[in-house]
């Protein structure tokens, strides 16, 4: 590396110091979460606006360190227009002993889906957002990554309605048990099979898309449970108690609870999502699109995953297929994700060394690409 590439400067962002490359200027905070603080900045080399995420105390414990490693590996792996791209990664520390900070540089978007949900979306915008969501999910699935935790706060959009998925969901080892309380993170969008601690397949993510679509139409969360039990109750009150064949697939203790709940017949999708909630242009085309949207919801929001629509089927549904582009839907699959990362056990120091090697490798790769 040249001396210029070693130059860093420090900016105070709230109560956090950002020590970043001198190529990035005009920092301003745009968000913070459990995994880090994000600032918008301007990249003077590429001459584009970017988002810089400082991972929050990545070596505080084994869980944080493992999560940081997984996120970094996945961001390097995937490459799709509907998944946030990694533009750069760096650390201001120059050796393993001092290493403590990881910065990820990503594309800058305008808003997350929470803000978009508050707007009155017409059918074209809504179906286009859903189409892009499904394309991104299909790409993750092609790498063997099943998300399980899609939610509006982790989906970002630009003013031109382009959409990107911002994270990679739950690690395969992140099981959830039915009686877990209280809620630490938002679980409103998690599928019944995740809430109930069952096995799951790729269409677990379709449930989340259905919840997000329903929220776009209603303007409010569909199943705002305070814990897993309340979540389950909210689902069956609206959609009805599932069939005995579904109950048979539950673990005995969970089945015992679920079978002893009052039985609900649920409501029709015409009642759950009446015409008045949809864009109304008072024409035949608008009514047909509302009917198509309801039909898609009725196939996504199915408690039994064996009866739920697949990602491929959803992409071909009448409400979505107007946007269908084979190059976007069937983009080249990334290398399969090595799930042994999720199973691996290391000390914090070992994870730290692995992450340091990844960051150094990434910095070297970027430098070589720039100097060719």
UniProtKB/Swiss-Prot annotation:
EC number(s) reported in the record: 2.7.11.24
Domain Protein kinase: 24-320
Source taxonomy: Eukaryota, Metazoa, Ecdysozoa, Arthropoda, Hexapoda
Protein family (similarity comment): Belongs to the protein kinase superfamily. CMGC Ser/Thr protein kinase family. MAP kinase subfamily.
Kinase found in the keyword field: yes
Modified residues (Phosphothreonine): 181
Organism: Drosophila melanogaster
Protein's recorded name: Stress-activated protein kinase JNK
InterPro entries reported in the protein's UniProt record: Kinase-like_dom_sf, MAP_kinase, MAP_kinase_CS, MAPK_JNK, Prot_kinase_dom, Ser/Thr_kinase_AS
Reaction(s) this enzyme catalyzes, per UniProt: L-seryl-[protein] + ATP = O-phospho-L-seryl-[protein] + ADP + H(+); L-threonyl-[protein] + ATP = O-phospho-L-threonyl-[protein] + ADP + H(+)
